[in-house]
């Protein structure tokens, strides 16, 4: 696995596209790690201090993710070094997408990512540059559909991603019009933990869980974990957190979901961050779902949780550990050897899978069909790992080996 990983990490990407905005200090990159299967996919992010190395490592990560979610294409990523709060943001994105539009018409598919919104920015702005849909390049390069079929599948994709959830089983409140895109990643994080317990002949019911981060992913993960019978005992967010050792009820978790302001936890009983960050890691818990920013979790925090009975980690965040390596750093390796660490590219592949589902062929557009497809994709990936490794450790190492064998 280590040799495969080194080979994969050190291989130069096929395409690097570099852009400097003529009107501001913005600079952007698209890195296409490979045109596996004729195309590549990966979102567009924006933040101050972003550099080409960040974009490259994310492109490599996307390629690994596609081995689970499909389609069987290469990984890519776009990044713009610019302040997303700057009022000139829209102009920067307009000029960026104009420059990158030939790639988007031919072999590169993109979407929203950190500080770039799929629905309000990516779709309308790429459309102005003559791109039918941000994923058009994946249709062109990989699926090669007939013109009529392409129109049909682009329609499916457009409606599917912004589809409002009508089935109360999948939504904290149907009246609030939450979309598939809002909920699917957190759903996958919860399902991954559930399937892992099932494949090992155990059940998630009654297991205690700590969720880190209460944005789209963390809040949805807490909602679905609670719904399936796990007991959420702690939530830690950037502003603070909450602890309830005998577990919050499903109603309480649903209320917290509905009360969150944007990506932030809101509660009258909020424990300040400095205090919760001391306490939460030594709570008794079986499940940990890191769903905040990347590279936050220290070995010390993990060891505390292992000491109080941690069993399974299901990653909502990409690379949640504070390692410098792209993939398999020392904290991750240490954790993988001690507990069942389900890697990000399995547990958080929900959104990528939804894209693949709508692109592959004409499909059912019901909530149940969409969510079941993601659940089944994650279940199969966990089953493949189990077929190679029936123990409860080395899960991530086994998963990487399965993925990299397809790529190297």
Feature annotation, model-predicted:
Residues 68-72, 77-204:
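Glycine/serine-rich phosphate-binding loop and adjoining beta1-alpha1 elements at the start
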Residues 1-20:
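Short, Gly/Pro- and small/polar-rich lid/capping loops
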Residues 306-408:
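Adenosine-phosphate binding glycine-rich loop
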Residues 50-54, 87-91, 95, 117, ...:
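Conserved active-site and cofactor/substrate-binding residues in soluble primary-metabolism enzymes
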Residues 23-36, 67-72:
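N-terminal glycine-rich anion-binding loops that anchor highly charged ligand groups
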Residues 166-284:
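Glycine-rich phosphate/diphosphate-binding loop of Rossmann-like nucleotide-binding domains
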Residues 240-341:
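Rossmann-like adenosine-cofactor binding region
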